[in-house]
């Protein structure tokens, strides 16, 4: 310890910043644990079509002037806010986080609605491939197996499924927000580090474009999920079966045809 103090006080270290580990990084055994942190990305260049005052707007050249509080700083800002939901900075920050998180969940959810049905159509056996019917399998004999494998979590109880989801999803979300074994978190919305093993956010320009792609695809996924819900209520079929029916007979199997079935008096 004395040697280290003398080294730091020597002239060769004068004027230089020295990274000293915090107390949380020093274990009881005297070892230093390096915690992977995330650095914030540099601002995207002014040449990007998705950011800044000259960014792409929601109606292109016919959009008019965007509200003063929509400056094009964040991804997905097309200058449209007729309801004024983003006028308050605190509300805007909250809604922005909610939108990004919902985008991510709905993108996963949309895949979960489509792929089991797609696999079932190609010979892969499922207990129930239609997404809104799959949960009912837990009430049938044999219960519900995670990933269709009885050697994994075998549940005949909603509480067991709920507990698994709380542990698996809650732990990851907790690490994303507050850090933990995966490293210290600087930005909970874009934690990076161990949440970005491929290093997709290393380049600021590429990362800024990926943020735009994420929000655009996430918004489409939210509309898709809304469509899946409506289809399930109206037709009682999964999305791929509805698509196949529409392609086979587009005149009689479309949104307008089903909507007219609910006309009063018909």
From Swiss-Prot:
Topological relation to the membrane, as annotated: Multi-pass membrane protein
BP GO annotations: photosynthesis, light harvesting
Modification type N2-acetylarginine: residues: 35
Quaternary structure and partners: The LHC complex consists of chlorophyll a-b binding proteins.
Organism: Petunia sp.
Gene Ontology cellular component list: chloroplast thylakoid membrane; photosystem I; photosystem II
Residues involved in chlorophyll b 5 binding: 165, 262
Sites where the protein binds chlorophyll a 5: 213, 231
Note: There are at least 16 genes for the major CAB protein which can be classified into at least 5 small multigene families.
Residues the record lists as binding chlorophyll b 1: 58
Transit peptide range per the UniProt entry: 1-34
Binding-site list for chlorophyll a 4: 217
Residues that span the membrane, as ranges: 100-120, 152-172, 220-240
Protein's name according to its UniProt entry: Chlorophyll a-b binding protein 13, chloroplastic
